[in-house]
């Protein structure tokens, strides 16, 4: 049971009585009475109602004796049966002046504080608490000091100010303060009656120095004055607000009447509209209960309150979202294939996968949508393919660009508690589509970044997991939403920058760059008609020859896709549009000569194979983000001491390939026919031209090995031959990537034969046969097979002299 708060009592003691209290002797073992919310100070008289059985036994026993007890404040306010661990260690010796037993069984005592003490040791806990204590002495200040006088005067002034500001304090208190003669008792009296927290009052009691106690008391009183001033301001503002609210009420009533007259929507009409839309939604019981709860909350909120628009917008989102409202898929596979072929040339793998999905969906209507990732170089039609897929399926199309997204809230949304909160881009996109099964393009998923605000790619893990996205939780939405019917298609230029866990959730479909023949067909079927239409030209106004298209592709673009090709075609079409608009003569059939006249000098120099009667010149093949290229590797020797020099801005992997090739060559000197001494008497320099362009990767391994073998044997290299493959110290030839792009680059450069690893044969089978009809392939497993094909028996016309002079024999002494 709680001990009650002290009632207002204004006792006065004289300095003489205070001096007698300081001299009074008290027993070293005292019964301890724990009290709540009360700190008793020496000299102060307080009434206390005692309700605990332990406390009642203690009071009744010692009231019959010398009436001396120890009063200690309870530190743990929640404890109903406090122990020594639940009370403070400093308390006040008290004399029980009076005791009253009330009809309800409670006992009220009037006590007066005498001396401060500190609990040293626990003596007993039953039938009441007893402890061994030591008395604490007060350090009294020199009252003649100006600082002490000023401090006490400030305390009195603050007390007077509180009395004037707080109407609940009796006016007699001011008279009592004025009549207190003892400065020490004045601080005790004010400390007991100040409006402060229990821990602050206990701190006042524990001070030994009276000056420190008065200083801390003054700080608490100043804080109390500040609180009273704030209360007064609030009280004044409340009265003003009530008047304003009454005025607003009458104005709103007038506005309501005017709205009814004009036919405008009122809040009640908005509520009815939301409820009517809610009845049409296919919600689960949980979502419907959540809507009803938020709706009930909105109806209780003042329309002028800041929370009103947030809650209203939230409810609008709930009723505007499509919940299980799927568009009807068109299961005509022939039509779907025609649409995909009509909009995009090639891309066989992707088209086949979409047709498979549509076929399975036709057989099993509740199939979860796949998560596809179209991976390939820029400009090959990854993003635009999404539109064609949506068109083929008769679904809505939504696109979200992830490039530069660095805030997790862009995916999951913000919580409603934040100002300007809104749902994430996923939920926003679903709302715009008005269906639960759109085609959703996540563009540039490899370009997501992260910072201190979170990792968006981690947030996408839930979105792109077919096992989890049926219960996607948006922070703003606060209820689960089913994304399992959404056909997510991500696009990416690279895979290494995508988080591994995210990459694992997607079905990766690689889209390679277009061949020259494919680009010609794309230009004729798609790009040229599109540019004519965009620039207002008719079909008969202009036509391109195949040679003109090839000229644009080879001399003015260098890319795997067709973006720049479209720009250059657009430039030619615009030039013709100017001629038509100005009614000047022009050539309707565009030839290569007209292309150069309109576009100017060639932007790129075409890679062509150049045959040289030199040793060590080998044609390798390289892959770039813009397609394949031929890579010339040169090596030369000069007299020296076996120094190896590598140049051409080679990366670490390519340098290691050169070192491995040289080591393998030195290990096979006998089989190849090289004098092992040449490695110590000649310096070797390997160079890869286009020194400003960084080059790296292991695919030049066999080309480097062939170049070194030709240099140290001075034998010719087979003409019109190119090669690509990684080499090992055991002489094995390993497969490499980018085969399609490399093969097409070799064909454009005039290469006739190509050496590849035997394990790359499967890559050749995926290339359209007409594209490689004029090429001969050699599939090898070892470096010896490479040299057998690449090195001719005859030497070059002017071979370098590799003879090493015999060292003179040392004579025996």
UniProtKB/Swiss-Prot annotation:
Q: Which residues bind ATP?
A: 376-383
Annotated family:
Belongs to the peptidase S16 family.
Q: Enumerate the spans annotated as Lon proteolytic domain.
A: 612-793
| GO MF entries | ATP binding; ATP hydrolysis activity; ATP-dependent peptidase activity; sequence-specific DNA binding; serine-type endopeptidase activity
List the HAMAP family hit by this protein, alphabetically: lon_bact
Query: Which Pfam family, any one of them, does this sequence belong to?
Result: Lon_C
Which GO biological process entries does UniProt record here? cellular response to heat; protein quality control for misfolded or incompletely synthesized proteins
Q: Which GO terms describe its cellular component?
A: cytoplasm
Q: What class of enzyme is it?
A: hydrolase
The EC number(s) given in the record are 3.4.21.53
Question: What is its biological role?
Answer: ATP-dependent serine protease that mediates the selective degradation of mutant and abnormal proteins as well as certain short-lived regulatory proteins. Required for cellular homeostasis and for survival from DNA damage and developmental changes induced by stress. Degrades polypeptides processively to yield small peptide fragments that are 5 to 10 amino acids long. Binds to DNA in a double-stranded, site-specific manner.
Q: What is this protein called?
A: Lon protease
Q: Which reaction does it catalyse?
A: Hydrolysis of proteins in presence of ATP
Q: What induces it?
A: By heat shock.
Q: Per UniProt, which keywords does this protein have?
A: ATP-binding, Cytoplasm, Hydrolase, Nucleotide-binding, Protease, Serine protease, Stress response
Q: Tell me where it mainly resides.
A: cytoplasm
- What quaternary structure, including any partners, is listed in this protein's UniProt entry? Homohexamer. Organized in a ring with a central cavity.
- Domain of life here? Bacteria
What is the organism lineage in this UniProt record?
Bacteria, Pseudomonadati, Bacteroidota, Cytophagia, Cytophagales
Tell me where it resides.
Answer: Cytoplasm
């Amino acid at each position: 049971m709680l001990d009650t708060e002290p009632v207002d009592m204004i006792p006065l003691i004289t300095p003489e009585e205070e001096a007698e209290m300081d001299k009074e002797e008290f027993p070293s073992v005292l019964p301890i009475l724990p009290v709540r919310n009360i700190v008793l100070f020496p000299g102060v008289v307080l009434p206390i109602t005692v309700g605990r059985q332990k406390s009642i036994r203690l009071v009744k026993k010692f009231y019959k004796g010398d009436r001396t007890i120890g009063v200690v404040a309870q530190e743990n306010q929640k404890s109903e049966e406090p122990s020594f661990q639940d009370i403070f260690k400093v308390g006040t010796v008290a004399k029980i002046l009076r005791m009253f037993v009330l009809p309800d069984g409670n006992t009220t005592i009037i006590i007066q504080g005498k001396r401060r003490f500190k609990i040293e040791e626990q003596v007993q806990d039953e039938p009441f608490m007893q402890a061994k204590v030591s008395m604490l002495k007060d350090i009294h200040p020199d009252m003649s000091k100006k600082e002490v006088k000023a401090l006490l005067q400030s305390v009195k002034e603050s007390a007077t100010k509180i009395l004037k500001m707080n109407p609940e304090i009796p006016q007699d208190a001011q008279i009592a303060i004025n009549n207190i003669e003892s400065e020490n008792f004045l601080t005790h009296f004010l400390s007991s009656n100040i409006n402060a927290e229990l821990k602050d009052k206990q701190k006042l009691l524990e001070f030994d120095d009276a000056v420190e106690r008065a200083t801390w008391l003054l700080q608490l009183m100043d804080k109390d004055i500040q609180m009273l001033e704030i209360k007064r301001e609030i009280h004044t503002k409340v009265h003003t607000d009530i008047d304003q609210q009454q005025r607003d009420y009458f104005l709103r009533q007038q506005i309501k009447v005017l709205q009814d007259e004009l036919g405008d929507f009122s809040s009640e009409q908005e509520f009815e509209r939301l409820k009517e839309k809610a009845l049409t939604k296919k919600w689960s019981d949980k979502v419907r209960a959540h809507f009803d709860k938020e709706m009930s909350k909105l109806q209780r909120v003042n329309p002028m309150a800041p929370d009103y628009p947030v809650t209203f917008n939230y409810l609008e989102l709930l009723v505007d979202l499509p919940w299980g409202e799927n568009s009807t898929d068109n299961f005509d596979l022939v039509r779907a294939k025609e649409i995909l072929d009509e909009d995009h040339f090639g891309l066989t793998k992707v088209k086949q996968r979409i047709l498979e999905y549509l076929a399975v969906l036709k057989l099993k209507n509740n199939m979860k949508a796949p998560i596809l990732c179209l991976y390939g170089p820029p400009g090959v039609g990854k993003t635009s393919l999404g539109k064609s897929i949506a068109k083929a399926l008769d679904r809505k199309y939504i696109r979200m660009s992830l490039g530069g997204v660095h805030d997790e809230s862009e995916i999951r949304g913000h919580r409603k508690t934040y100002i300007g909160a809104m749902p994430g881009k996923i939920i926003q996109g679903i709302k715009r589509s008005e269906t639960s099964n759109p085609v959703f393009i996540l563009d540039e998923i490899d370009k997501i970044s992260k910072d201190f605000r979170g990792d968006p790619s981690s947030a996408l893990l839930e979105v792109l997991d077919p096992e989890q996205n049926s219960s996607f939780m948006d922070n703003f939405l606060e209820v689960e939403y089913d994304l399992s019917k959404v056909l997510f298609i991500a696009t990416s230029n690279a895979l290494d920058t995508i988080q591994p866990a995210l990459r694992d959730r997607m079905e990766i479909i690689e889209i390679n760059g277009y061949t020259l023949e494919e680009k010609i067909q794309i230009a004729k079927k798609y790009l040229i008609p599109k540019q004519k239409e965009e620039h207002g030209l008719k079909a008969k106004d202009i036509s391109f020859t195949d040679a003109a298209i090839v000229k644009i592709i080879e001399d003015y673009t260098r890319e795997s896709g067709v973006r720049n090709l479209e720009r250059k075609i657009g430039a030619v079409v615009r030039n013709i549009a100017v001629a038509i608009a100005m009614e000047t003569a022009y050539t309707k059939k565009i030839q290569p000569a007209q292309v150069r006249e309109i576009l100017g000098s060639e932007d790129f120099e075409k890679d062509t194979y150049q045959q040289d009667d030199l040793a060590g010149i080998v044609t390798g093949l390289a892959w770039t983000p813009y397609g394949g290229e031929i890579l010339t590797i040169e090596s030369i020797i000069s007299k020296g001491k076996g120094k190896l020099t590598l140049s051409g801005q080679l990366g670490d992997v390519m340098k290691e390939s050169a070192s491995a090739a040289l080591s393998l060559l030195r290990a096979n000197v006998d089989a190849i026919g090289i004098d092992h001494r040449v490695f110590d008497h000649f310096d070797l320099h390997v160079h890869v031209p286009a020194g400003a362009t960084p080059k790296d990767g292991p695919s030049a391994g066999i080309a480097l090995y062939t170049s070194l073998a030709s240099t140290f044997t001075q034998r010719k290299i087979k003409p019109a031959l190119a090669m690509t493959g990684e080499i090992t110290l055991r002489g094995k030839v390993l497969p490499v990537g980018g085969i399609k792009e490399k093969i097409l680059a070799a064909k454009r450069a005039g290469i006739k034969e190509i050496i590849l690893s035997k394990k790359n044969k499967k890559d050749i089978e995926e290339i359209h046969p007409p594209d490689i009809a004029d090429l001969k392939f050699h599939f090898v497993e070892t470096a010896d097979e490479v040299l057998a094909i690449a090195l001719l028996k005859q030497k070059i016309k002017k071979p370098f002299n590799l003879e090493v002079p015999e060292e003179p024999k040392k004579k025996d002494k």
